[in-house]
Amino acid sequence: MRAYYFDNIPGDQRLPHDSGRPVSEDTLRKLNISYWRIELDGYLPKLNAVAEERGYKNRDFINVSKAGLGDSYEEKLKNFFSEHMHEDEEIRYVVDGSGFFDVRESPSDEWIRIGVEPGDLLVIPAGIYHRFTLDENNYIKAIRLFQDEPKWIPYNRSEETEVNPHRINYLREIGVGA
C-alpha cells in the first residue's frame, strides 16, 4: 500500500496521479481507514482472525476486469469511480492485480490516492467519500468482506448524503463538524 495526495491533473484515471506529497498510515488512521499487510502465502488464518475481530460474517470474490465483469465492465468502472459513500464499511483484501482507492480527506476535501496490490487489506469506513479505479493493468481480484449479507450500495455525493446519519457519524468520529 502506498498513499499520497492525488494531483488533480486531468487525464487517464488509471495513471498514478502522484502529486509527490506522501500520506502516512497515521494520517489514514485519523480518517478511520484501517490497513493490514497479510502476505498471500497462508493468508486465510490471518484474514479469518481480522474478520472475526471485526464481526465480518460473509465474504465473496470480485474480479474487476473485462473477463470478470463481461458486458457490465465499462458501466461498473464508471460507477466505481463516481464519488460516493456507503452506509457500511468497504473491506477489500487484494489477492491479484492492483488498483487505486481515492478517499476524501476531511475537512480539506483533498483526494488521497491509496494504491493497493496483492496482500493489502484495506477497510474504508462507512460515511467517507471515496471512489475506486483500476490501474493500467486493468485487473484486480479481491475478497470482499461483509458484516451482514453481501451488498454494495453506493450513495453518490449530494446534498442528501451530507445529512446522511452515517456521514454525520463518520465526521463526528474523526472530529470534524461535531
Swiss-Prot record:
Catalysed reactions, semicolon-separated: 1,2-dihydroxy-5-(methylsulfanyl)pent-1-en-3-one + O2 = 4-methylsulfanyl-2-oxobutanoate + formate + 2 H(+); 1,2-dihydroxy-5-(methylsulfanyl)pent-1-en-3-one + O2 = 3-(methylsulfanyl)propanoate + CO + formate + 2 H(+)
Coiled-coil residue windows: none
Subcellular location: Cytoplasm; Nucleus
Example of a GO cellular component annotation carried by this entry: cytoplasm
Predominant location: cytoplasm
Keyword Oxidoreductase included in the entry's annotation: yes
Cofactor: Fe(2+); Ni(2+)
Classification via SUPFAM superfamilies: RmlC-like cupins
InterPro entries: ARD, ARD_euk, RmlC-like_jellyroll, RmlC_Cupin_sf
Family: Belongs to the acireductone dioxygenase (ARD) family.
Protein name: Acireductone dioxygenase 1
